[in-house]
Regions:
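Structural signature of tandem-repeat unit edges
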Residues: 8-22, 31-44, 54-67, 77-92, ...
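Sterically constrained small-residue positions within well-ordered secondary structures
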Residues: 52, 75, 100, 123, ...
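Short, aromatic/basic amphipathic alpha-helical patches
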Residues: 165-168, 188-204
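Small disulfide-bonded, cysteine-rich extracellular recognition modules and tandem repeats
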Residues: 7, 76, 124, 147, ...
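Secondary-structure capping and domain/repeat boundary segments
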Residues: 83, 180-182, 198-282
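Intrinsically disordered, low-complexity segments enriched in proline/serine/threonine
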Residues: 3, 19, 26, 64, ...
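Consensus positions within tandem repeat domains that build extended binding/scaffold surfaces
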Residues: 1-5, 24-27, 46-49, 69-74, ...
Length: 282
């Protein structure tokens, strides 16, 4: 551990050779490296392994990685792009993993992830877009606190609880939208009023609206924009607009207003059985 900790003269690209399976705690913390090449089958990134690497701009982890320990990439202030491993054994984004990564703009959580721990993305002040895993169950306290440019986040129906007093969404952008995979999540979002307009989980009705996708998700390239309702997708159905009531009656809308709740309308595709006899034109 701490092999190159605070070696500020260590810069450029670091190549991790074949045969290395773990990056121990603090190994490259507070160095000046700008990129990393993984040539082997690394499975674990240790505690604070790349913390405060102020020149590190992008990282693509190999699909062999199963564990990213707490604080691994915290305060990497130039980190703009991070690609998670596609590994069914990678199930948790640990505490403070990306805390203080002020240039990180978007996060696509892989389907294997079931838990995002506390403060995982806290203070990511340039984070604009987050798409959570459809298998996510747990979101820790302050996970996205002070992500002040975050214009949209999708919370899948698989999330079973949003604990009170955790300030998960505190500090989102004006006219931002929180997309909910199920209407069951509405009550969780509105629980425990901290004041007349905001709740203890950080949802502020003066700044943010809710949009229920009713099982719909979003394509990987979907852009969430303040004041605009993004278009969801749902297998076996066609999206038929956003509405201001759960019955999806009246006129569809495309823009959002803070404090409102919107509902997605779907038209189910039906494949009618067609039988034709040989030689028939009917």
């Amino acid at each position: 551990p701490q092999a190159f900790y605070k070696c500020s003269s260590l810069n450029g690209t670091i190549s991790v050779p074949v045969g290395v399976f773990s990056i121990p705690s603090y190994t490259f913390a507070a160095t000046s490296i700008s990129s990393i090449e993984f040539n082997g089958a690394v499975t674990e990134i240790g505690v604070n392994a790349f913390m405060e690497c102020s020149s590190l701009t992008s990282i693509t982890l190999p699909d062999t990685v199963t564990t990213i320990a707490p604080g691994a990439f915290s305060n990497c202030i130039q980190l703009e792009c991070f690609v998670f491993p596609e590994n069914p054994q990678f199930t948790k984004i640990s505490k403070e993993t990306f805390k203080g990564c002020t240039k990180l703009e978007e996060v696509l959580i892989p389907s294997s992830v079931t838990e995002i721990a506390e403060s995982a993305f806290q203070g990511c002040t340039n984070l604009k877009r987050v798409v959570l895993s459809n298998n996510l169950n747990t979101i820790g306290s302050m996970a996205f606190k002070d992500a002040s440019l975050m214009e949209g986040v999708y919370i899948p129906a698989s999330v079973s609880s949003i604990p009170e007093n955790n300030q998960i969404f505190k500090g989102m952008a004006n006219n931002s939208v929180i997309y909910l995979g199920s209407s069951d999540l509405i009550s969780l979002m509105l629980q425990s009023k901290a004041n007349p307009t905001s709740t203890s989980n950080g949802f502020d009705s003066e700044k943010t609206s809710l949009a229920v996708t009713d099982g719909g998700t979003f394509a990987a390239d979907t852009k969430f924009e303040s004041g605009k309702l993004a278009t969801p997708i749902k297998e076996g159905s066609i999206f038929d607009g956003w509405y201001k009531n759960e019955g999806c009656t009246g006129t569809a809308v495309t823009t959002s207003t803070a404090g409102e709740t919107y509902y997605a309308k779907w038209i189910e595709l039906k494949s009618d059985a067609i039988s034709m006899e040989y030689g028939s034109t009917q």
